[in-house]
Swiss-Prot record:
<dbReference type="InterPro" id="IPR036873">
    <property type="entry name" value="Rhodanese-like_dom_sf"/>
</dbReference>
<protein>
    <recommendedName>
        <fullName>Uncharacterized protein HI_0744</fullName>
    </recommendedName>
</protein>
<dbReference type="Pfam" id="PF00581">
    <property type="entry name" value="Rhodanese"/>
</dbReference>
<feature type="domain" description="Rhodanese">
    <location>
        <begin position="54"/>
        <end position="148"/>
    </location>
</feature>
<dbReference type="InterPro" id="IPR050229">
    <property type="entry name" value="GlpE_sulfurtransferase"/>
</dbReference>
<dbReference type="InterPro" id="IPR001763">
    <property type="entry name" value="Rhodanese-like_dom"/>
</dbReference>
Amino acid sequence: MQEFISMATEFAQKHTLLAVSWFAIFVMVIYTFYKGATSKFKVITHNEVIRLINSDEAIVVDLRSLEEFQRGHIINSINVLPSEIKNQNIGKLESHKENALILVDTNGTSASASAVFLTKQGFNSVFVLKEGLSAWVAANLPLVKKHK
């Protein structure tokens, strides 16, 4: 064991940038697993979204702008902006506190922040569509268009 430590130390001294890079990647992987394990919401695939909608009466919350929402959204979605959730202006969602909420954004990058706010406001069953509506469209799943 001591030989391994001396070899690792020697390697780190000779290849500092590489050693620091590997350490940073290791820390990021650990952080990602920790964050996922302690998160109060779950990131799910489009197949799981379909199952939740069909079996658990889940509510789909579309976080995109009204214009994007009108161009196409998952059937029966409710359009709520992330700023409304952040400012606790969630009247549209209050009656659905006991339902599973599925948050959908464009590509899955911003819905997590809204999920954190909703779990803090007492919503117990919050999910985020992995890769957002782009994954839904890529899987050739249907969208509803709403005209002005």
